[in-house]
Amino acid sequence: MAGAAPEGSQFDARQFDTKMNELLSADGQDFFTSYDEVYDSFDAMGLQENLLRGIYAYGFEKPSAIQQRGIVPFCKGLDVIQQAQSGTGKTATFCSGILQQLAYELLECQALVLAPTRELAQQIEKVMRALGDYLGVKVTACVGGTSVREDQRILSSGVHVVVGTPGRVFDMLRRQSLRPDHIKMFVLDEADEMLSRGFKDQIYDIFQLLPPKIQVGVFSATMPPEALEITRKFMNKPVRILVKRDELTLEGIKQFYVNVDKEEWKLETLCDLYETLAITQSVIFVNTRRKVDWLTDKMRSRDHTVSATHGDMDQNTRDIIMREFRSGSSRVLITTDLLARGIDVQQVSLVINFDLPTQPENYLHRIGRSGRFGRKGVAINFVTKDDERMLSDIQRFYNVVIEELPANVADLL
């Protein structure tokens, strides 16, 4: 389960700039390595032929902005801090960097990737396996909620890459089922979430068990001050690839709000929307597991076909629900922030924040589902009186204006 952010850690632009200035001040001026090369095609990156085959077979034609700048320094063994929003090809960036450097004849774990949720870890495992299809990569996901014995069996048979959540990975290292001797690459994905209070200590514990000379990659959609601070602890002159704060919201996603006078009127507002819009697929976010169940029951009682998933469900049930949603047999998914970072569905055209997120950072992970790789999408936020402060925080955080939902919203989908 993703850890909660530290008390009082809401993003503050001045705090961010102060921390960045500290890192770039006289004491920190040598902290970063500059790397300015941009590669307009995958062919120009000097990648192995069989890795290129995997990249093209996966459906990539041209590298995204983060891939143009991020794959090659990682392939060269440099430590990297990369900030890019959801849906920009961030996962494929570090997967390509890892796959390029593996010694495939050595069937030992050489790369360890940590992610904050099971769903995201499994998503990364799929991308790694697909891109490395022609290289013969052996990759496994070690995540909570699955059989420890099965993980131990797979690890003892030999793998090149382990992707996992911090708790299970630390457990495997502690039991010596995962041997760290040959690990030469360590990646933290969604570091903003991982380095919040819930996982910070576990990451330190894992890092202590890894070889001293190791390449570290930190990948994140947002870069709160604590994420920048912690990079000092275990990175060596990293290449820094940051997008400006005001570029963080995905282009192509239209964002609106609907004023709802009372919390209990949100349901009527939602049903009205579904009666007026032709929706391919949509995700509805609420803030608690109990509310997922409540809203699912209410929608079904009004003859809306919906699926629901949250952290109280066992892993097998969640996998089945996500498979149905990906295949399109289920068109509406109700969920919580916990799963926001593991949903990768190309057809999602609409995200509804039935509840606004409790932290501005999570807004990006939610609406980033609705327009991946330039696809158009719409995000609609339900806003009560109590939410007005958070709405203005979100607008300030991402430097965007979220407008009131127009009458012709159907034309936008």
Swiss-Prot record:
Gene Ontology biological process terms from the UniProt entry: cytoplasmic translational initiation
Domain of life: Eukaryota
Assembly and oligomerization: eIF4F is a multi-subunit complex, the composition of which varies with external and internal environmental conditions. It is composed of at least EIF4A, EIF4E and EIF4G.
Function: ATP-dependent RNA helicase which is a subunit of the eIF4F complex involved in cap recognition and is required for mRNA binding to ribosome. In the current model of translation initiation, eIF4A unwinds RNA secondary structures in the 5'-UTR of mRNAs which is necessary to allow efficient binding of the small ribosomal subunit, and subsequent scanning for the initiator codon.
Catalysed reactions listed for this entry: ATP + H2O = ADP + phosphate + H(+)
E.C. no: 3.6.4.13
Binding-site residues for ATP, renumbered to this chain: 84-91
Motif window: Q motif: 40-68
Enzyme class, broadest EC rank: hydrolase
Residue span, Helicase ATP-binding domain: 71-241
Family: Belongs to the DEAD box helicase family. eIF4A subfamily.
Keywords: ATP-binding, Helicase, Hydrolase, Initiation factor, Nucleotide-binding, Protein biosynthesis, RNA-binding
Alphabetized GO MF terms: ATP binding; ATP hydrolysis activity; RNA binding; RNA helicase activity; translation initiation factor activity
InterPro entries registered for this protein in UniProt: DEAD/DEAH_box_helicase_dom, Helicase_ATP-bd, Helicase_C-like, P-loop_NTPase, RNA-helicase_DEAD-box_CS, RNA_helicase_DEAD_Q_motif
Protein name from the UniProt record: Eukaryotic initiation factor 4A-15
